[in-house]
């Protein structure tokens, strides 16, 4: 298993994690591990639409032409 050292973590963040861990009956280390695991799992389940939207935002947005027809006069024969 890998080990990670986090330097310069604010006291407020450390206290918040300790409080969250204590409330869940876990150690601070176990709580941090759970938080990181949840983030890693969420990253793996990114959907295509979300990924494309993120790319669009990174490049400043994209204007797409509306290509749907506006004519509603055609009857549909089933």
Curated annotation (Swiss-Prot):
A GO molecular-function annotation: sequence-specific DNA binding
Keywords associated with the record: DNA-binding, Toxin-antitoxin system
InterPro entries: Arc_rbn_hlx_hlx (IPR013321), FitA-like_RHH (IPR053853), Ribbon_hlx_hlx (IPR010985)
Protein's GO biological process: migration in host; regulation of DNA-templated transcription
Phenotype caused by lack of the gene: Disruption of the fitAB operon leads to faster transepithelial cell trafficking of the bacterium; mutants adhere to and invade cells normally. Mutants grow normally in liquid culture but much faster within human cell lines A431 and T84; these latter 2 phenotypes were observed using MS11A bacteria with a disrupted fitAB locus.
Protein's job: Antitoxin component of a type II toxin-antitoxin (TA) system. Plays a role in the speed with which bacteria traverse human epithelial cells; disruption of the locus increases the speed of trafficking about 2-4-fold. Binds to its own promoter, binding affinity of the FitAB complex is 20-30-fold higher than FitA alone. No nuclease activity was observed for the FitAB complex, perhaps because FitA (the antitoxin) prevents metal binding and thus catalysis by FitB.
Oligomer and partners: Homodimer in the absence of FitB; forms a heterodimer with FitB; 4 FitAB heterodimers form a complex that binds to fitAB promoter DNA. The complex is also seen in solution.
Name used for this protein in its record: Antitoxin FitA
Organism taxonomic ancestry: Bacteria, Pseudomonadati, Pseudomonadota, Betaproteobacteria, Neisseriales
